[in-house]
């Protein structure tokens, strides 16, 4: 089930010291990929929905507009952003909503580096943006492949 939420912020500060990025950007909360090794299920407890991480996917309808506002601030230092750190940014519904694509367009506009991982081939839809970004500033993509063994 998909549930719309309105984002108050796009970027969340990550001061754990365990990651190379200082800010997280999560377009979705919850994940239909249902990976057995998922480390992000804890994030649903903040939505009072901790038993339904793989069934209820929340999408932040206004995320691109908020991201554009935050990256436009004079105080923004172009820190590295972890894009989709709590769940995959290419959920099946992304094909219709295009929220991650809109966020990529904002990142291109502001020339802001990011790290993203996905297991979805839907990332190929955005290869035009990713190619253009890689010509202008550093980006890092990690792709996982599902196997049966």
Residue ranges, per PLM feature:
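Conserved Radical SAM active-site core
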Residues: 1-28, 32-142, 148
């Amino acid at each position: 089930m998909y549930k719309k939420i309105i984002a108050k912020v796009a970027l969340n500060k990550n001061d754990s010291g365990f990651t190379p990025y200082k800010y997280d950007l999560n377009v979705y909360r919850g994940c239909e990929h249902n990976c057995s090794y998922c480390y992000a299920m804890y994030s649903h407890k903040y939505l009072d929905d901790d038993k339904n991480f793989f069934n209820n996917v929340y999408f932040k309808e206004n995320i691109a507009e908020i991201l554009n506002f935050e990256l436009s601030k004079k105080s923004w230092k172009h820190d590295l952003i972890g894009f989709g750190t709590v769940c995959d940014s290419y959920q099946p519904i992304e094909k219709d909503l295009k929220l991650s694509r809109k966020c990529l367009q904002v990142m291109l506009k502001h020339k802001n580096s990011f790290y993203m991982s996905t297991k979805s081939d839907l990332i190929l839809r955005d290869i035009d943006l990713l190619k253009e970004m890689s010509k202008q500033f550093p980006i890092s993509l990690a792709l996982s492949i599902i196997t049966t063994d």
